[in-house]
Amino acid sequence: MAPTPLPLEQMPGVGGGGGGYLPAAQEGGPRINTMSMSVLIDFIIQRTYHELTVLAELLPRKTDMERKVEIYNYAARTRHLFTRLNALVKWGNSVSKVDKSSQIMSFLDKQNMLFVETADMLARMSRETLVRARLPNFHIPAAVEVLTTGTYNRLPTCIRERIVPADAITPAEKRQTLLRLNQVIQHRLVTGKLLPQMREFRIRNGRVTFEVKHEFSVSLTVMGDNPTVPWRLLDIDVLVEDKETGDGKSLVHPLQVNYIHQLIQARLVENPNALSEVYNCLHYFCQSLQLEVLYTQTLRLNYERLDDNNITVEEYVPGVKLTVSYWRDLKSELGYRLTVQSDPSEIGRPLAVVHVPSLGAKESAEVADRAVRSEHLSMERLIVHTVYIRSVSRLSDLKLEFQAFLKDVDFNLQGTPAILTVPVLSPCLRAEQIHITIDTHTGMFRCHVPKHLDCPIMEEMQDCLNGDRSKLPALLSELRFWITHRRCDKTLQHLPATATETLPFLVQPDQEILQPGRHKIYVKLHRHPNIVLVVQLKEKTTMPNEMEYTFHLGFVAYQKDELDVIDDSAMQLVSIVAQPHSDIPKCYTKLMRLIEFDTFVATHGPGTEVDAEVSPHKRKSNGDLLAPPAKQQKTIFPAYFIPELAHVVAMCDEKIPFMNLAQTLSKHNIPHSGLQVEANATSLVLKILALPQPGKTTFATQQQQQQGAPAVAGENKPSGTSGLPKIDSHVWDDLMRRVLSISIRSQTNKNSQVRIWVVEFVFYSTPLQSSHPKEQGSRRTVYLTYEQANYDFSKTVEDLLNDWSKIVYLYTLVYDFAEQLLNKRLSLCDMLVVKSYSYMNLLLGYGPKKEVSCNIYWSVQSHGFRLTFVGGMSAVNGHSMMRDQLAQHLNQQHSITQIAQILHETYNPLSSIAKLPVLPFLGIPRPQVPVLSFCVLAQSPCLIRLTYQAVYCLELRFRANRLVSIRDGASSRFERNVVEEFTPIQGLKAFLSKYVDESAVYRGRASHEDDNPLSPMGMEDNFGGPSSVAGVSAGGSSPFLGTGMRGPQSPRDSGLRFPAPHTPPSSSNPHTPASPHPSAGAGGGSGPQGHGNFNLTSPPAPHMPHPSPSGLMPSSPLNPQPSPHMVHSPGPNTLYMQSHQDSPFTAMSPANNNWPGSPSMPRPSPRPGQSPDHKSTGGGAGVAGGTDRGGSRGTLNRPWAGAVPTLLTHEALETLCRPSPYPNKDINVPDMSPLERFLGCVYMRRQLHRNIQSEETLTALNSTEPGVVLFKVDGLQCQVVLNQMHMQTLHLKVSQLPPMPDKHPPPFQLSQDDLLVIEQYFDTRVAAPPYRPNSLHSICRLLNLPAQVLKDFVQIMRLDLKPELGGDQLKWTVQICLRMPPSAVPIVPSGNACVVMGRMKILFFLQITRIPYGAVIGVGKDWKDSPSLVLPIVYDIQTNVTQLAERTGQVISPTMTAASTLLRRFAEFNAQQNQCTLFPAITDLLTNLQLAAEMPQPPPNQSIGPPVGVGVGVGSSPNPMMPMQQLPQQVGPQGPVGPGGYPQMGPNPGGPQ
């Protein structure tokens, strides 16, 4: 490949050089004066910036016009320059073609010039150079040798020696040479003189290394085997270090090491003792360095941590010695100092330490070895160890001084720093010993007791140790007593006592022990303020470290001054009579008595352990086999615990209350055996021999009677003591025989840690056998507890006597009851079971399963027996409501047998009554006032009153043979007026007659009556209880209607329905009802005779003496009722009639009637009226129960008929009171008792009548039917009637009013289907539980609306009742709120009627609930998460506009805003003049209302949540007191046209599409 020629400008000698052949401007040559574009731009910018800088410097000196001219010129030049640059850049984009052509031309020019130059050079060589050229004589052999062999061996010697290095020796030769050198060095050391300090060396690799510990290490060698060859110094390593202040750096600089190396090497030449010279030089240098290090450390220690008072450098001679003094505060003649110096007599020895005063040779050498002759050269260690040695020496001397006056005491000297411990007591804790040490800085003695750092004696003892030591024995004795005092405090820390050293005596006692200055303490007992224990402290003569204790018991009294007189009661152990309160505190103490204890007797008694040793060879008896080991280990107490003191204090604290109690028992004339110790020394016991019979005068009563004060609370009996049970002598003797023992002990409550008295009664069996598993043995114990906190022991005894009275009085009843329990004729065992009898309480179980209980006990406060009742697992105890009446009966009769029979016979009816709800309800009379649904008022054990919502009252009397009489409690028993608090119940007699069982009533009469008819009071006795219990004949007359009293139908009234009697009024008058009164504890009932003395006038006279609150007669099944077809068209729609199976209007008849024109003819009721729980007998439907066997319509419908008692069986009462399903099965409401439903319907009917009278828009109409409310509204006639089948539901009958003859017919009327919807809505929403009168107000206001508006409301009612009629397009269900819900906008007060009309506007509330996606109305779908909304709707009748009611400033939720927007849009675009827009607007709202994606939290007055009702589309009531009403699932094909002419709404198969 041909070589590529270089460019011409890159060739040497061509181009711009001086030897080139091309002219500079010749075409084809290299282009000069060219530069790159980037350099050009840099130059332009640099020029512009430079001109701008110069301009900025020169302009301030010129005038304004000159500055403007210069700025303009600068801008013009710069603009022109950059314009040319811009043109150049644009041209450069197309210069590539020109460059290629120029490169080609340049290459051709270069080739041409290359040939020309080659020819010229060859010509010059031939003409000038080669003329004189000659070839040299080449060295052919050398060239051949180099080329063939690659080496050259003919190099001259002079060159070879100077340039070529010699060959290296082999490793074997090297090892042989070093081994030979080691032998030479070893021979030199053996034959030469070697110092003892240099005996440690090692020979390795041809060198010898000498090492002197803690000073230096040096290496030497020799350069030959000639003895005259001098040693050569190889290496020097100084081993002196400063590990405290050196900071890890070397103490010797390398230049110093080099200098020493040169110096020693110079001295090694021609020196016979070369090695000695090496040691002397290096040893002196290292010792000087060590002294310098110690001096530096001392200065730094003195500067940083210590001062001149602790250590001071007294003298420092470099390289010679260093003297440091310490403990400068001690007054020593020589002073304490140490000197570190070199040995002047022998240079080779290390540094020595000299102590002043001198120490022993062993201690001094130990100090030097620790601090100087070690790797860690430290002055601090040297001083510390010196101080430790000095401290041990001084403490040893002090120990000898202590041993001089403290014999047989174990002293201990140990520790670092050294501590001397001196025990002052025996035994003594280490923390209680005196710890003596020496201050390392000052050398002074320091002492303290670790357990008592605040000991005041330590300061004086420390001064004594550092000064005059003659006072040490006395100070030790004071310290011994002081620590003993502290031990006493520690011992009493967990005992109820406090130790003190002095008492505030106003006059110093004469006793020697109480004189000042004696070593003693006073122990105050917390529970006994008048007792002081004096503890005298003494040192044993033989052993001063041991203490002796002497105890004295002192009785003290408190006085405020010298004139204060102290009575004799202070001489007692504890003052029983409370001292009068004084304004001036009694702060001074006076000693009354002082008793000395024998310490041995006090600490050794029946309550202490006995140490006994038994011979190992002695055989144990049978009684000793189970005993603990004979040799018991002695209890070891802590040294700070004084067992003698604790034992004496505990003994006093335990026995003093017993002594006080024993004194109090003696004063109450109660015999006892005194304080004793129980077997095995378990506790103290005080046994009572006998207790007095209750009711007798006690000591406290006698004392108070003597002082003129009333008796104590436990004995202040009422004036009439006849109410107390009589204690027969044989009963008392039997109880005394059963009492085995009465013991009093003292214990501590585990929970409150309070001491209590425990009184144990031990009885022998009981006369009454119980079923309790713990009461089956023959030994029965009763435990009573009393507090010891109070110091009034008389009260404790009185409480004991009161509890004893509980046992005795209850025993008097139990003794008789036990005998009667064995009598099989009374059958008490079948009535009850005795669950427990503990002598204090009698627990009886009764009822069907004997699971309810009655507890009988004696109450001291009420001086009578009390009863408490407890229910069972599956039953409640209904006797709790008449607990006081039963207790009163027991206190009067004193017979448990009668109480048992009453409990047995009244259990079933009271259990039935207990099932009635007693919860308070809101919204009955007023929305904010709660009223009890039922309230039970007990009058006697067999008479109660039952009120309903504080309006109606029932009087129930329990009778024998499982019968109960019920009458209206609103009628007074004493006069013919009505009780003001209550209202008579209309139709009560007819309602109760449906539950009468005639056979049971006849059986009850057969057992108590003669052949003669009964009087009206025949079924009631004077006592008020069952005749079997009271034993009173049932044929007595009424005690309230005797001579001188007129009955309710007195002949003095003119115009009465009955003729005046010719004989005085008697109890056999059938028209003289007896009425109970709440204040009557007992009374009688009435029952009319069987004759028919009745006035058949219909309706009854308005002047009857028993008016009804509404003026209506009670209905009866025998009353002629209008047929349900009289207000229906011939072809009624059965869609809304099929769900009312119990309604009296469901039976259709083609007959017509002129209702409400004239009274109809009597005919049978559509359905027979029979009790829900028994079939109708052959006597006809609706036979009047109780005492009216005739069952005539007139008797049942009389206003006073409810006042006549009606006899019911227990089963019928249970049926009345037990919650049962609603008669209309289609209405889903909570179960409710028939009695509550009947009273609720009567109450609603009464409220409706009052509402008709108060509302101007409602017009009352006269009705010939009793118990029927008839009224009319605008175009409609309404009839509200009680269902006569069961009298538990109200029904509404609506019909169009016929047009007046002189008026035109109304332009718009409701269809028959609309009327059926109204009736059904009234039955399911208004007259259904819970019964609220405000719902009636709302429905009446809706009925009074114009027919066209009412029709739209009827459509909403239809959608409310049957949501499935809405079809698929509805997304919400709707409900009409009849009462104001609390969750709605507060426009109307909560609970009030929320349908408001005024100024041609209607305000009502709707609750809408979102239908879940995919849900089908009527199918069980979970609705709990469906949001619900209460909308306040306002409909304007004049403008025909439906809108949302909004309050100014009210914050509403986004959903409410969307609903308001929909209603406004509907009013704007869908308004029709000839059609009411209410229902279409609501339908549009239910169809198009959408929920926001993120529902915000609603305001407090507007809650959005799931509906209350779950499972159907009916929704829920917005008021929590009105439960949800449900309709049955009715899904099926409907007609093509819906009710009212609106298009038919198909079923809703799912949610919104």
UniProtKB/Swiss-Prot annotation:
<dbReference type="InterPro" id="IPR055107">
    <property type="entry name" value="Med14_RM8"/>
</dbReference>
<dbReference type="GO" id="GO:0016592">
    <property type="term" value="C:mediator complex"/>
</dbReference>
<dbReference type="InterPro" id="IPR055114">
    <property type="entry name" value="Med14_RM6"/>
</dbReference>
<dbReference type="InterPro" id="IPR056878">
    <property type="entry name" value="RM5_Med14"/>
</dbReference>
<feature type="region of interest" description="Disordered">
    <location>
        <begin position="1513"/>
        <end position="1553"/>
    </location>
</feature>
<dbReference type="Pfam" id="PF25069">
    <property type="entry name" value="Med14_C"/>
</dbReference>
<keyword id="KW-0805">Transcription regulation</keyword>
<dbReference type="Pfam" id="PF25067">
    <property type="entry name" value="RM5_Med14"/>
</dbReference>
<feature type="short sequence motif" description="LXXLL motif 2">
    <location>
        <begin position="472"/>
        <end position="476"/>
    </location>
</feature>
<protein>
    <recommendedName>
        <fullName>Mediator of RNA polymerase II transcription subunit 14</fullName>
    </recommendedName>
</protein>
<dbReference type="InterPro" id="IPR055122">
    <property type="entry name" value="Med14_N"/>
</dbReference>
<feature type="short sequence motif" description="LXXLL motif 1">
    <location>
        <begin position="55"/>
        <end position="59"/>
    </location>
</feature>
<dbReference type="Pfam" id="PF22983">
    <property type="entry name" value="RM8_Med14"/>
</dbReference>
<dbReference type="GO" id="GO:0006357">
    <property type="term" value="P:regulation of transcription by RNA polymerase II"/>
</dbReference>
<feature type="compositionally biased region" description="Low complexity">
    <location>
        <begin position="1024"/>
        <end position="1039"/>
    </location>
</feature>
<feature type="region of interest" description="Disordered">
    <location>
        <begin position="699"/>
        <end position="723"/>
    </location>
</feature>
<dbReference type="InterPro" id="IPR013947">
    <property type="entry name" value="Mediator_Med14"/>
</dbReference>
<keyword id="KW-0804">Transcription</keyword>
<comment type="subunit">
    <text>Component of the Mediator complex, which may include CDK8, MED4, MED6, MED11, MED14, MED17, MED18, MED20, MED21, MED22, MED27, MED28, MED30 and MED31.</text>
</comment>
<dbReference type="InterPro" id="IPR055113">
    <property type="entry name" value="Med14_RM2"/>
</dbReference>
<feature type="compositionally biased region" description="Pro residues">
    <location>
        <begin position="1099"/>
        <end position="1108"/>
    </location>
</feature>
<feature type="modified residue" description="Phosphoserine">
    <location>
        <position position="615"/>
    </location>
</feature>
<feature type="compositionally biased region" description="Low complexity">
    <location>
        <begin position="1515"/>
        <end position="1534"/>
    </location>
</feature>
<keyword id="KW-0597">Phosphoprotein</keyword>
<dbReference type="Pfam" id="PF25065">
    <property type="entry name" value="RM3_Med14"/>
</dbReference>
<feature type="compositionally biased region" description="Low complexity">
    <location>
        <begin position="1065"/>
        <end position="1080"/>
    </location>
</feature>
<dbReference type="Pfam" id="PF22984">
    <property type="entry name" value="RM6_Med14"/>
</dbReference>
<dbReference type="InterPro" id="IPR056879">
    <property type="entry name" value="RM3_Med14"/>
</dbReference>
<keyword id="KW-0010">Activator</keyword>
<dbReference type="GO" id="GO:0070847">
    <property type="term" value="C:core mediator complex"/>
</dbReference>
<comment type="similarity">
    <text>Belongs to the Mediator complex subunit 14 family.</text>
</comment>
<feature type="compositionally biased region" description="Pro residues">
    <location>
        <begin position="1159"/>
        <end position="1169"/>
    </location>
</feature>
<dbReference type="InterPro" id="IPR056877">
    <property type="entry name" value="Med14_C"/>
</dbReference>
<keyword id="KW-0677">Repeat</keyword>
<feature type="modified residue" description="Phosphoserine">
    <location>
        <position position="1015"/>
    </location>
</feature>
<feature type="compositionally biased region" description="Polar residues">
    <location>
        <begin position="1131"/>
        <end position="1155"/>
    </location>
</feature>
<feature type="compositionally biased region" description="Gly residues">
    <location>
        <begin position="1177"/>
        <end position="1193"/>
    </location>
</feature>
<dbReference type="GO" id="GO:0060260">
    <property type="term" value="P:regulation of transcription initiation by RNA polymerase II"/>
</dbReference>
<feature type="compositionally biased region" description="Gly residues">
    <location>
        <begin position="1081"/>
        <end position="1090"/>
    </location>
</feature>
<keyword id="KW-0539">Nucleus</keyword>
<comment type="function">
    <text>Component of the Mediator complex, a coactivator involved in the regulated transcription of nearly all RNA polymerase II-dependent genes. Mediator functions as a bridge to convey information from gene-specific regulatory proteins to the basal RNA polymerase II transcription machinery. Mediator is recruited to promoters by direct interactions with regulatory proteins and serves as a scaffold for the assembly of a functional pre-initiation complex with RNA polymerase II and the general transcription factors. Required for activated transcription of the MtnA, MtnB and MtnD genes.</text>
</comment>
<dbReference type="Pfam" id="PF22981">
    <property type="entry name" value="RM2_Med14"/>
</dbReference>
